[in-house]
Amino acid sequence: MNSAARMGLQYVLLFGASGVSLPFASLWFRAQGLSGAQIGVLLAAPMLGRIVTGPLLAVWADGFRTRRAPIALLGLVMALGYGGAGLLDGFAPRAVCWFIGATAAAALIPLSDVLTLRLAARDGFTFALPRGCGSVAFVAVNVGMGALLLKAEVDVIVVWVTLMGLAIAVTAALFLPGEPVGEGATLRKRDRFRGLGRLVVDPVFMTAIFAVGAVQAAHAFQYGFSA
């Protein structure tokens, strides 16, 4: 299996999870007796927290020798978080677990994008090819889960995203190429934060970030309460 196919499989799993969690999580929360306000808090908290968790996880990921190592670990964390949300009762424990699972799931996509871009430049394939596999998977599981929920219990939602997290972890550890994070020795934590600081003070970069954030905020509301 070449690197493009391996990354295509990774994106199928990634978007196979988000194609269920984004539109159907609120349906599961409602079945647990949560109010609309509580559901909004649960869905919004990981996205607001991403202002901090996103950069920190990026710096953390650059501390590994290979790009696939943090992807595998985050897949496992995603499974544990979503699985814990399904097993625990009470708003607070469920909120903490969902925050952990959703934060890990969100970080997996940009980390996979970085790996894919590096491999595409090295091996000569088009980035859109494996990424497109993920888009197809998103639509397919979205429609498939919607049809399944006409007959199945809503708990299948949490079971699905938990299993997807485990599949991502196994696939990353065993099948993704062992692309190094950088040439030579691993960067010290201080040097990794210095690179982050240069981005934060770049006005063009920050303007783009705020623009993308506005788009994502609109998507979040639409997806979160679409079911």
Spans of model-derived segments:
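Structural signature of the two symmetry-related core transmembrane helices
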Residues: 69-83
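Helix-loop boundary and gating motifs at the non-cytosolic
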Residues: 1-47, 204-212, 216-227
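Helix-loop junctions at membrane interfaces in 12-TM secondary transporters
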Residues: 2-4, 86-98
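Cytoplasmic helix-loop-helix junction between adjacent transmembrane helices
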Residues: 98-134
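Helix-to-loop junctions at the C-terminal end of transmembrane segments
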Residues: 51-66, 149-150
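Symmetry-related core transmembrane helices of the 12-TM Major Facilitator Superfamily/SLC fold
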Residues: 157-174
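Juxtamembrane intracellular "pre-TM" segments in multi-pass secondary transporters
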Residues: 1, 176-211
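Residue-level signature of mid-helix packing/kink "hotspots" within the transmembrane helices
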Residues: 47-55, 138-139, 143
